[in-house]
Curated annotation (Swiss-Prot):
Listed name of the protein: Threonine--tRNA ligase
Gene name tied to this protein: thrS
This protein's record includes keyword tRNA-binding: yes
Lineage: Bacteria, Bacillati, Bacillota, Clostridia, Peptostreptococcales
Main location: cytoplasm
Organism: Clostridioides difficile (strain 630)
Catalysed reactions, as listed in the record: tRNA(Thr) + L-threonine + ATP = L-threonyl-tRNA(Thr) + AMP + diphosphate + H(+)
Length: 639
């Protein structure tokens, strides 16, 4: 009997070898209709995969990550088949699934335009309707080369030539179309009904600018048209909220041509950034943290001690000073360790919470840069907590609660991911097991659900990642808690224990915002530029109806300014309707309109960005109301 262990813990038994699809059918016909892929003992396979020995089996639907990857990989093959039907002279390169879709790189003299994409998309839908069976077959390397040479697929020939001579090469065939591929794929083309080709861009073969520029066609696909339409609507909304667009319109930041990847914050952007840092410092002071500022440039010896020189050097900017190697810090961790070693410590000092808003620099390829989301220089809100082994759980819980409070202030929901040991790591198996268990047990005691991300920990320890969910349902990895049992040894951190002997402390690395710049980019898109009052660069704009009310407008401005409210006065000789529209476009939370009646009654006419006309009230009353709103840090998301 073949025993198949399912995800829910149940065991199915079969007398003979059986396909994954038939296992699904044995559970229910409904499941068989919806399943798109599976994993056998952790390896993702197609539904035609034959099970002939005991195994663990997970069945994936489209909504599962693995299911989407297989579905969209098949979509890429359908795209390639459609291209070959319409442009037989095209040569195919590669076509993987990617986050939210797929692409295929092609070599074609004809420059594709949007109208061409519509034709290709229509052909893809036709192929889906044909319900072509997708079959895998394998060939020895020499026969695989012959096949691709016969088809004139030069790029496939190059890929196969790079493989060992003993390699068995797999292909997938659908109708009269065959493509080199590792797989797996759907059983047929019929499920890929909801498809959209989105754009075409240039891409060098194998990412090398010395190679030929190919055309990369991007697309996405879903099981249902309704889901595709919802996704395309989400993309349109995301375009409106793009932080690069809004950052320019609202005068928050710029990326100068002279410094790609090095953002420059403008006056209004600095108001926003400083408000975030003020909030961060307030929260951390209350939680018992002390703040330091470590040097931006440190010598090679330090980075060798930390391990960065061996594990992270390709991401670091290096410089020669007095004929010695130095590096601009890519992380703040070593600075915290230098601070720790600057004085002697007793067990009574713990836990010792050291925070830093440190400027870091990391080398990113120009093609990876994206506004504030991917930069070469940013401020990271690092903290390093030194503690006794018995304090680990409580400190992890404390950090998790602190980060939870920060995210709730902005209206974010989040999910947690526990990342385990990567291949390129420091330390023994026992140390990694202890560190991973410490994080796992803390999360379980807090009752926080989490998923495991195998092999994605830092090289010096496992970590908990916080993935924020914004108002569009997108997720962003921001906060991190890393338990480190390696660097305290590398830096010879010690303390005197109760026994009078030297001991090694345990250390937690943690961030809440992560990159401040990236977090600001997320906030811009999350709020669509309509920041809550406490965060808004300009909280109030005073709009006098005409010049003769300018004196009163200036008095109002002074009173607001003296109360710490960020206020601007529009003193231009423009009509009031124009001023209101401009302030609304600038997304200022409150507009105070002053005219003859307001001067006479010593009032202000209040207009809210989000609620419209509020009416005429006493200035003191307005100041009390907005001050309360600022102090409470209300963060209501407005549509």
């Amino acid at each position: 009997m073949i025993k198949v262990a399912l995800k829910d813990g149940s065991i199915k038994e079969f007398e003979n070898a059986i396909s994954v699809m038939d296992v699904a059918k044995s559970i229910s016909e409904g499941l068989a209709r919806n399943v798109v892929a599976a994993s056998v003992n952790g390896e993702v396979v197609g539904l035609d995969h034959i099970i002939d020995t005991d195994c663990d089996l997970n069945l994936f639907k489209f909504e599962d990550k693995e299911g989407k990857e297989v579905f969209r990989h098949t979509s890429a093959h359908i795209l390639a088949q459609a291209i070959k039907r319409l442009y037989p002279e095209a040569k195919l390169a590669i076509g993987p699934s990617i986050e939210n879709g797929f692409y295929y790189d092609i070599d074609l003299d004809h420059r594709l335009v949007p109208e061409d994409l519509e034709k290709i998309e229509a052909e893809m839908k036709k192929i889906a309707k044909e319900d072509l069976k997708i079959e895998r077959f394998e060939l020895p390397r020499n026969e695989a080369l012959e096949l691709m040479k016969e088809q004139g697929e030069d790029y496939k020939v190059e890929l196969i030539s790079d493989l060992p001579e003993s390699e068995i090469i797999s292909f997938y065939k659908q109708g009269d179309f065959t493509d080199l591929c590792r797989g797996p794929h759907l059983p047929s083309t019929k499920k890929v009904k909801a498809v959209k080709l989105q754009s075409v861009a240039g891409a060098y073969w194998r990412g090398d600018e010395n190679n030929k520029m190919l055309q990369r066609i991007y697309g996405t696909s879903f099981e249902k048209n309704k889901d595709l339409e919802e996704y395309l609507h989400l993309l349109e909304e995301a375009k409106k909220r793009d932080h690069r667009k809004l950052g320019k319109e609202l005068g928050l930041f710029m990326i100068p041509e002279e410094g790609p990847g090095f953002p420059m914050f403008l006056p209004k952007g600095m108001e926003l950034k400083n408000e975030l840092l003020k909030f961060w410092r307030e929260i951390h002071r209350k939680a018992g943290y002390i703040e330091i500022e470590s040097p931006i440039i440190l010598n090679r010896k330090l980075w060798e001690t930390s391990g960065h020189w061996y594990h992270y050097k390709e991401n670091m900017y290096t410089v020669k000073i007095d004929d010695e190697d130095y590096a601009i810090k890519p992380m703040n961790c070593p600075g915290g360790l230098i601070y720790y070693n600057s004085q002697l410590h007793s067990y009574r000092d713990f836990p010792m919470r050291v925070a830093e808003l440190g400027r870091v620099h990391r080398h990113e390829l120009s093609g990876a840069l994206q506004g504030l989301m991917r930069v070469r220089a940013f401020t990271q809100d690092d903290s390093h907590i030194f503690m006794l082994p018995e304090q680990i759980k409580d400190e992890i819980k404390g950090v998790a609660n602190l980060i939870d409070g920060i995210y709730k202030t902005f209206g974010f929901e989040y999910n947690l991911e526990l990342s385990t040991r990567p291949e390129n790591s420091m330390g023994s198996d026992e140390e990694w097991e202890a560190a991973e268990n410490g994080l796992r047990e803390a999360l379980e005691e807090l009752g926080l659900p989490y998923t495991i991300n195998e092999g994605d920990g830092a090289f010096y320890g496992p970590k908990i990642d916080f993935h924020l969910k914004d108002c569009l349902g997108r997720t962003w990895q921001c906060g991190t808690i890393q338990l480190d049992m390696q660097l305290p040894r590398q830096f010879d951190n010690t303390y005197i224990g109760q026994d009078g002997e030297k001991h090694r402390p345990v250390m937690i690395h943690r961030v809440a915002f992560g990159s401040i710049e990236r977090f600001i980019g997320i906030l811009i898109e999350h709020y669509a530029g309509k920041f809550p009052v406490w965060l808004s660069p300009t909280q109030v704009k005073i709009l006098p109806i005409s010049d003769k009310f300018m004196d009163y407008a200036n008095e109002v401005k002074k009173e607001l300014f003296d109360k710490g409210i960020r206020v601007e006065l529009d003193d231009r000789a423009e009509k009031i309707g124009f001023k209101i529209r401009e302030a609304q476009l600038e997304k200022v939370p409150y507009m105070l309109i002053v005219g003859e009646k307001e001067v006479a009654d010593n009032n202000v006419s209040v207009r809210s960005r989000d609620k419209g006309e509020i009416g005429s009230i006493k200035l003191d009353e307005f100041i009390a109301s907005i001050s309360k709103e600022i102090e409470s840090r209300e963060s209501i998301i407005q549509d």
